[in-house]
């Protein structure tokens, strides 16, 4: 009778570890992306120049603000 209990506890521990690991990794990645966004002003300026646009600082600031606001909304909606 102790054998099946040991097997059951091992399975429960594995499932608990997987779920806990998933949520810890998810939180770590969200914090990492918030601190180190995947795109910065210099990358945005280069992309606009490659598309044939002349990037002004005002336009770059608007796009960065829009991207940051979008990322914040996505993080808030994923927390629910």
From Swiss-Prot:
Keywords from the UniProt entry: Membrane, Transmembrane, Transmembrane helix
GO cellular component, one term: plasma membrane
Record's subcellular location: Membrane
N-terminal signal peptide: none
Transmembrane segments: 4-24
Homology family: Belongs to the UPF0154 family.
InterPro entries: EF-hand-dom_pair, UPF0154
Bilayer topology: Single-pass membrane protein
Record carries keyword NAD: no
Name of the protein this chain belongs to: UPF0154 protein SH1564
Any Pfam family: UPF0154
HAMAP family reported for this sequence: UPF0154
Domain of life: Bacteria
